[in-house]
């Protein structure tokens, strides 16, 4: 049943026996017809992967009264789907139902909503049903009709009611399901988030109810209830998810901009000594920023409150940390606090990571649990930076072998927390973090030429271990679900091509940003001043190893991730901040302060 727009979860919860939640209508803002097609094909990708936009579709009555999409229009839909480096099959749900001898139909008021049940040939109910057989139908209705149908349902009847798409920007659709076993707050393994499911989960839900196996090309998962209906919780969840994207610029971007301006003012007002102090506080604040965002997710304050937590709280706490643990030690403490906070959260499964402003932004429709691209870039850089800074601050005389062991241990622990599907669910963490650690270890041990083969071996071993862990623990991560369970390693080519296209798109998008070109200027400056930067680290070889490892992890993430430009900017900023600390503390023998303790 497709209900009028603006129907609420609270209204659906008033229907007897109906479980409720919110439905992600697509990846980003998509037209209604795309949402309906996604339901029918059981898979969805970002609009940028398609060759062209979706044409306007009509569902008309054909010969014998059979509803269908005109062949030219359906041909355009199939051709558009074939252009995507993924297994997208428009009409898959309708064809699967027909092959199982299920009667498929649509009411006269269904309109384009019938696209959800159109088969692969663009027709509705093309296969006949002989004798008694199940029926799956779609139609438009109002809330009163839903109440009436829910009251008359019995046995294995299933009534699915969704708000008519598209939803308002940065919002989701209200969803209700009535039937035996669905009275509760809805969820699915696609999101692992109570109260939030995907459009691609509807098809598997219908098929599971009918006892029909889900086709391998469907990526959605069956919807199920999780606890009693909790309208207040669902509404609060929707509100918080809707705030994540819009708040990123004012809370994160403006705060960092203010910090940079204050750093420049300190340099002008207090010259060399002021810049030393300001750069160290800036780096520590940047390292603490993600941890402050996790606190914001827990407290769910107003936008002003979150800006104060980040914009004021981070520098104040950074200054306190640096007073207690000056120089590289303070940077290590701040980096460790952020990495540890998110590791504990994803392992505990509290979902604060998903609700934080640096989390995966579930309402965007791409990732719904674990860490997103922003956190992947942050963690991949902070792990080697923090490890190197800790060694330089607390164990400056550690042997190369001991330092290498430390880098290896922190990398293994970080991958164990952020890569498996049961925790951080980010395969990129199994690539970037091991590469960063391998480079740091190589510098600590002074390896030459063939010794750098471990830079290649480390991520391969980590990904292999990740697959084994997910299969053993039932992590059901994207890697195992889409590659091993749905066609084997042959799908890796499609995934690689898809990531390259999305990464190229991200560079094209960020190329219009002034911040992007500032970061590029920082990178170019760093390359031209490489020897001078190395000199600022001086005898602190472990800090230098951590810095270079962070650069390697950032480069690996940029090449392997579908948001390459974003990872490049985040990693480059954190690496530049580390250089700032190295410069600020490299003269500590001549000018000791409480920011940089004198060498004994």
Where are these regions (language model features)?
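Membrane-water interface signatures at transmembrane helix termini and the short loops
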Residues: 291-308, 414-434, 530-575
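Soluble extramembrane regions of membrane proteins in the secretory/endomembrane system
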Residues: 1-246
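Short aromatic-rich membrane-water interface segments that cap or initiate transmembrane helices
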Residues: 241-252, 360-382, 422, 484-515
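Hydrophobic alpha-helical segments of polytopic membrane proteins
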Residues: 410-413, 428-466, 575-577
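Aromatic-rich transmembrane-lumenal/periplasmic boundary elements in polytopic membrane proteins
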Residues: 332-360, 365, 454-456, 460-490
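Membrane-interface capping segments at transmembrane-helix boundaries
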Residues: 269-271, 394-398, 448-450, 528-536, ...
């Amino acid at each position: 049943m497709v209900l009028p727009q603006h129907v609420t979860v609270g209204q659906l919860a008033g229907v007897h026996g109906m479980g409720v939640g919110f439905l992600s209508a697509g990846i980003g803002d998509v037209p209604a017809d795309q949402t309906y097609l996604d339901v029918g094909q059981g898979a969805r990708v970002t609009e940028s992967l398609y060759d062209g936009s979706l044409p306007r579709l009509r569902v008309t009555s054909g010969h014998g009264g059979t509803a269908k999409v005109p062949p030219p229009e359906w041909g355009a839909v199939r051709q558009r789907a074939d252009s995507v480096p993924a297994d997208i099959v428009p009409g898959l749900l309708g064809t699967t139902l027909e092959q199982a001898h299920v009667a498929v139909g649509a009411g006269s008021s269904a309109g384009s909503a019938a696209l959800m049940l159109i088969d692969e040939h663009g027709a509705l109910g093309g296969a006949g049903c002989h004798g008694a057989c199940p029926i799956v139908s779609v139609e438009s209705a109002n809330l009163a009709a839903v109440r009436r149908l829910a009251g008359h349902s019995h046995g294995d009847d299933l009534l699915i009611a969704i708000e008519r798409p598209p939803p308002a920007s940065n919002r989701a659709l209200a969803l209700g399901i009535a039937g035996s076993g669905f009275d509760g707050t809805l969820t699915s393994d696609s999101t692992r988030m109570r109260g939030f499911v995907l459009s691609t989960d509807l098809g598997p839900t219908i098929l599971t109810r009918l006892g029909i196996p889900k086709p391998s090309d469907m990526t959605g998962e069956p919807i199920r209830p999780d606890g009693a209906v909790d309208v207040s919780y669902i509404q609060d969840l929707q509100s918080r998810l809707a705030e994540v994207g819009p708040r990123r610029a004012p809370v994160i971007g403006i705060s960092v901009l203010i910090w940079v301006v204050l750093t420049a003012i300190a340099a002008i007002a207090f010259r060399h000594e002021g810049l030393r102090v300001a750069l160290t506080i800036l780096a520590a604040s940047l390292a603490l920023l993600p941890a402050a965002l996790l606190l914001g997710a827990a407290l769910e304050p107003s936008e002003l409150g979150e800006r104060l937590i980040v914009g004021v709280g981070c520098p104040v706490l950074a200054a306190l940390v640096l007073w207690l643990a000056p120089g590289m030690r303070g940077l290590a403490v701040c980096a460790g606090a952020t990495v540890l906070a998110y590791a504990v959260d994803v392992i505990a499964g509290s979902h604060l990571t998903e609700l934080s402003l640096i989390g995966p932004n579930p309402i965007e429709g791409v990732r719904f649990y674990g860490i997103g691209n922003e956190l992947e870039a942050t963690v991949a850089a902070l792990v080697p930076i923090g490890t190197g800074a800790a060694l330089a601050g607390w164990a400056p005389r550690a042997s190369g072998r001991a330092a290498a062991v430390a880098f290896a241990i922190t990398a293994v622990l970080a991958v164990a927390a952020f890569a498996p599907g049961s925790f951080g669910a980010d395969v990129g963490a199994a690539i970037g973090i091991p590469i960063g650690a391998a480079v740091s270890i190589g510098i600590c041990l002074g390896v030459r030429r063939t010794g750098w083969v471990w830079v290649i071996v480390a991520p391969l071993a980590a990904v292999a271990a990740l697959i084994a862990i997910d299969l053993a623990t039932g992590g059901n991560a994207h890697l195992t679900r889409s590659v091993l369970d749905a066609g084997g390693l042959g799908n890796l080519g499609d995934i690689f091509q898809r990531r390259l296209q999305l990464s190229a798109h991200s560079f094209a998008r960020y190329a219009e940003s002034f911040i992007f070109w500032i970061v590029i200027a920082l990178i170019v400056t760093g390359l031209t001043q490489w020897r001078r930067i190395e000199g600022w680290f001086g005898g602190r070889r472990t800090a230098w190893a951590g810095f270079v490892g962070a650069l390697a992890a950032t480069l690996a993430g940029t090449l392997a991730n579908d948001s390459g430009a974003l990872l490049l900017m985040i990693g480059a900023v954190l690496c530049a901040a580390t250089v700032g600390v190295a410069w600020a503390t490299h003269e500590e023998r001549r000018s000791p302060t409480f920011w940089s303790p004198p060498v004994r």
